[in-house]
Amino acid sequence: MRAKRVRSRRELKAFIDLAPELAARRGDTDHYVPLFTSDIAQWHSHSGWFNEDVELWLIVDESGAPVARTICHSSPELAAKIAASDRPARATSDDVMPSNTTDTTDPAGEASLGRPSTLFFGALEAADAEALDHLIAHIGFRADQLGARRVFGPVSPLPNVTGGMLTAGTDRPGFFDTAWNPAFYADSFHAAGFASWGPAQTWEVEVGSIPAARATAVTEAEWEASGLRRRRISRFGLPAFVRRLLPTLNAAFAQLPYYTQISTAQLKSQMQGLTALMDPELIIDIAGIKDSSETPSRCFALVIPDPLPVLRRHGGRLGPSAILDLLVHRHELRDAVLIIQGTDPDFQGRGILSMAIRDLNSALCAKGYRRLRVTFIAEDNPASAAVFERSGGEPMHSLSFFDRHLDGRRR
């Protein structure tokens, strides 16, 4: 097996198509989570919101057929964040939140990442443990070439987009905006000397099991008594909601050791297709009773019907046919995904999140959803997990990042 840098459109197509092909070969089609192909194409062309160069790599077998893939990239901001603490800091309680041979014929390409202190990897796919072992060896080889002292991932391309690797619960399917991988991935990384970093869990709440007290909508009198109001979101009002949540989002997550500030361009990219998919009743935007329509949210929860069945059918391509598919089948999507929630640090500890989740649970019940799934809650943030535990939820997957110091130090 050997590593091959993706350079042509044909190789880019092979990189993109490898994920659904391997999932079908392994019998994991109903478990895997495709990345948006538009994101992968932008990484390859060095366009889009992510400012750093991204290298796309394939591991190919003796016949030249791809058997594994990854991206390698740098991020000075993320490298500085994780270097600041060898032990992940506690998240705030109101916040949720991912070959020995190489093709080196292009010296300019080899220097494209400069000399990063940390080499990040992501978008992992591997046919089996042998292919993954070659891929891990190549990631280390590439880090040595670039002079990186640390290797960290998976992040695609940042933890605030998609990050982490499942270490338990791989028998459960993945869902939108989170990671899924076969069980052998974590075993291979541990065997290669990587240490787990920032363990976390996803959660699942069976809507029919939510206690009545946690699924009763907040009354207008309760909102008023708390000096609050819920701003209703329409499809036409989604852009304004995105503008309001961004400052709250960045403030709420600023202390997390893996979180880098989200730009307007990044958030807009991550919201692609949301207008066609959203259920307005599941988007929570809490403001002060006297706040204007443009005042940033005091608390928010971004929840959508899980589009993964449609995205799997289209291999992660969110083109016109996929959008039409979403519109036609939107009412058949009975699982919801809480992508992100946050509370302005100035308003945390006042019970606002509990009220927001009550309204959310009430809407889930009223609209006939089967379950709510929640992305990535760090294990050192039990207060946030407790919100969903009180709603009858249970952990679904365990996951972590994987970290290796190339100078021999272990975390």
Language model features with spans:
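A conserved beta-strand-loop-helix scaffold within acyl/acetyltransferase catalytic domains
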Residues: 19-62, 70-80, 109-113, 232, ...
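Acyl-donor binding region in acyl/amide transferases
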Residues: 82-192, 315-390
